[in-house]
């Protein structure tokens, strides 16, 4: 256990961070992770203040780090890696990507896919808060660049403009 993200990166050569802190402190925790040039930050915390997330998104435009979340279950590539709270036992390696704003729908869809013998390359819960770091289009672009992903399942929420942008993409 380390006192700072920077110390963990220096000692363990970490390239990702998962944020599990109360909403009032989560913005600062994300900033701390962004300041260490990690490849990926996953913010599980729900309800990070909107002003904090607006500042985080401004900072994201200045760095090469991808933020998944907040208010998300995380990301998993079955059999390889998991960051977050996704129940790994329901996933099976395969060729279908999944991107969702809802953790519960993610679990249901993955369970249905796996039960039918359809495995997943990666599943990404992008988060349900008003301001998130990775959009549906960002996720679709990542899946498009992945030679192992042959199809993508997308689970949105009612009234979302991000879902409409993804449909146009």
Which residues fall in each region the model found?
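Catalytic-core regions of core metabolic enzymes
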Residues: 1-169
């Amino acid at each position: 256990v380390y006192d700072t993200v920077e110390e963990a990166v220096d000692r363990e050569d970490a390239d990702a961070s998962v944020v599990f802190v109360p909403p009032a402190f989560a913005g600062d925790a994300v900033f701390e992770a962004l300041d260490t040039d990690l490849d990926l930050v996953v913010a599980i915390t729900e309800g990070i203040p909107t002003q904090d997330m607006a500042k985080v998104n401004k900072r994201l435009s200045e760095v090469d780090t991808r933020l998944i979340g907040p208010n998300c279950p995380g990301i998993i590539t079955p059999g390889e890696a998991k960051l977050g709270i996704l129940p790994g036992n329901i996933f099976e390696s395969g060729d279908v990507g999944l991107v969702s704003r809802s953790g519960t729908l993610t679990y249901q869809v993955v369970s249905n896919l796996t039960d039918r013998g359809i495995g997943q390359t990666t599943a990404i819960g992008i988060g349900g808060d008003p301001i998130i770091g990775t959009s549906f289009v960002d996720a679709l672009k990542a899946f498009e660049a992945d030679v192992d992903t042959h199809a993508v399942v997308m689970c949105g929420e009612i009234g979302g403009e991000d879902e409409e942008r993804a449909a146009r993409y």
